[in-house]
A protein has these predicted regions:
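N-terminal post-signal-peptidase region of extra-cytosolic proteins
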Residues: 63-78, 103, 143-147
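Amphipathic, coiled-coil-like alpha-helical scaffolding segments used for oligomerization/assembly
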Residues: 79, 85, 91, 109-170
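Membrane-proximal juxtamembrane linkers immediately C-terminal to transmembrane helices
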Residues: 24-36
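Flexible, solvent-exposed short loops/turns enriched in glycine
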Residues: 47-60, 100, 105-123, 127
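Short extracytoplasmic
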Residues: 35-67
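Single-pass alpha-helical transmembrane signal-anchor segments
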Residues: 2-22
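Short beta-strands and strand-coil junctions in structured, solvent-facing domains, enriched
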Residues: 39-41, 75, 96-99, 130-131, ...
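Membrane-proximal alpha-helical signals and transmembrane carboxylates
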Residues: 2, 39-40, 114
């Protein structure tokens, strides 16, 4: 039995179209389906999903808690002592659409968050004396910093889970 000459190319074309229209969202990801660059659908649950081949593409964003390790910065305390403060933060993407529209990707988000966190650390720790920064009141200062950063991060579709001072040197 002879197979028609057009059957094999037709099967290949259909296979490519089916392959291009399916995508899998892993449990650790959330996805935004874009049509010509405009967001059309937000997918937060894991599973097999469909899109229009060659017209729509998919951007995957992490659902997990992500780490941000800031570069050490100099902070001048209220008693004019200079400190080198090294801070870390943990954050997660809570609004994928707002995140995609405001920052676009994780690299830009990290840069913006780093700037926001550094300014809030300087603002809050700059009003405190060195003895206060080294005492148990430091957890209160971190809570103030976290709340301040969270209000700004909400506009980026991000939630700050934790802000900590990893190291503070004179």
């Amino acid at each position: 039995m002879k197979i028609p000459k057009l059957l094999l190319p037709a099967v290949v074309v259909i296979g490519v179209i089916v392959f291009q229209s399916l995508f899998i969202v892993q449990e650790i990801n959330q996805a935004i389906v874009l049509q010509f660059g405009d967001p059309k659908k937000i997918i937060t649950k894991a599973g097999l999903n469909f899109k229009l081949p060659f017209i729509q593409n998919v951007v995957f964003l992490d659902k997990r808690i992500l780490n941000l390790d800031n570069d050490p910065q100099e902070v001048i305390a209220a008693d004019q002592k200079r400190l080198i403060v090294d801070a870390i933060a943990r954050f997660k993407i809570v609004d994928p659409l707002k995140f995609y529209i405001s920052v676009g990707n994780e690299r830009v988000a990290r840069s913006r968050l780093s700037t926001i966190i550094n300014s809030r650390i300087r603002g809050v720790l700059g009003t405190q004396e060195l003895a206060t920064l080294l005492s148990t009141d430091r957890t209160k200062q971190m809570a103030i910093i976290q709340n301040d950063v969270n209000t700004e991060a909400k506009t980026l579709g991000i939630q700050i889970v934790d802000v900590r001072i990893k190291r503070a040197d004179l």
